[in-house]
């Protein structure tokens, strides 16, 4: 029993024109990554909100964090950190998530601090009429 907690927080009234299955798969991969790299009792937060120019989704955990030498490589296919060899996976979850998010016109950023956790921020712009 890992006893990890997910906290969901956001507006009930946001909508995003997207391929629901693929975008769900992308976010699932990010959340699974958080589960894989947190200890028992960890908290994983998933928040979403409207911004003036779009929609933002944040997946944040209080896990071990991503080592600075790895942070610029985590979206490369088949990349596995030497610090994550004890977890399952082949290094395709985050690259797939990034590809799906970008195919939807979005962008993903990662911020991490060793021993404090990691935050993935996804932004989707809302098209405006000119």
Predicted regions and their residues:
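Short alpha-helical Gxxx[C/S/T] motif in the catalytic ATP-binding
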Residues: 93, 97
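Conserved micro-motifs of the catalytic ATP-binding
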Residues: 15-18
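Conserved glycine-rich
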Residues: 105-106
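Short beta-strand/loop element within the Bergerat-fold HATPase_c
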Residues: 41-53
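Acidic ATP/Mg2+-coordinating residue in the GHKL
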Residues: 61
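Short conserved segments within the C-terminal catalytic ATPase subdomain
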Residues: 1-8
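Short conserved segment of the HATPase_c
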Residues: 66-78, 98
